[in-house]
Amino acid sequence: MNTRGCVNNNKMIFMNALGLQPQSKLKIIAHKILEKCKRDAYTRFKGVKAIKNELKTYNLTLQQYNEALNQCALNDSRWRDTNNWHHDIEEGVKINKRHIYRVNFNSKTQEIEEYYYIKVECYVNS
């Protein structure tokens, strides 16, 4: 009878034979969070808030939290770069307030710098 430990050992032998490495715990956490949040359409910085709240549910140190947030930013940009269109049909004006969130991750110190931008794009029909 095979136990889970035996099955996991067989998987590791197979992965090592192919030269593959198992994913880190933080990459798996980031992937789970992005899968959970990918079906939502976010406006403004609500996607950033949702991802951060999901990360807080895991018992991570500050360095692990920062690295997982960076992994989320690298793997998917839908939650951190949103379009918020406003159409004024009478005036023929379309205004888009893009809310952009960027993460600068320092791998040596495991610290992040967060940047929040609002970019206004205006299109006028003449």
Swiss-Prot record:
Compartments, record wording: Virion
GO cellular component: viral capsid
Top-level taxon of origin: Viruses
Predominant subcellular localization, coarse grouping: virion
Keyword set, alphabetical order: Capsid protein, Virion
Stated name of the protein: Putative 15 kDa capsid protein
Organism: Autographa californica nuclear polyhedrosis virus
